[in-house]
Swiss-Prot record:
The active site is at C76 (nucleophile), H163, E165. GO terms for cellular component: cytosol. This is GMP synthase [glutamine-hydrolyzing] subunit A. Its EC number is 6.3.5.2. GO terms for molecular function: ATP binding; GMP synthase activity. Keywords: ATP-binding, Glutamine amidotransferase, GMP biosynthesis, Ligase, Nucleotide-binding, Purine biosynthesis. It is an enzyme of class 6 (ligase).
Amino acid sequence: MIVILNNGGQYVHRIHRSLRYLKIPSKIIPNSTPLAEIEENKEIKGIILSGGPDIEKASNCLDIALNSKLPILGICLGHQIIAKAYGGEIGRAESEEYAHSKIFVKEENDLFKNVPKEFTAWASHKDEVVGAPLNFEILAYSNICEVEAMKHKEKPIYGVQFHPEVSHTENGAEILKNFCKVCGLLGE
């Protein structure tokens, strides 16, 4: 099972639905749920930090990003939470995105396996990661956002600024499927 921490974003239920289409059990839980409570449930194999309007209302997710032993995928605000937790820089987007964005994958990796080097994704944010943390590598970028996706160099922690759960994102289901594989929920 994947738990989706609800940070109040408009697409949280789409994440749940997208996982259901992949036949992956998931559950939406409050973003205030303690990490110990999540990790004591042995059915939980991964965590998704959803998007949302306010990083200040997601402070518990900072602890989860830093201390979880489970794989994590941060989406939009969740991506920013991961960056902030590890010392990255969040700032106002140069161009507020509420539209399609062309994403460029730097090289194939666990998250972007079987995903083209260029694809169109749906973006919906005012803020973004403007400086990746030192212990993260940038996986993808766009012409208006230098850190569209990143990964911790040693832990299975990923962040994407765009929304793979939205149907407007090409290969979004494949990206979510790849995260599920990282969690050990799908075979190769």
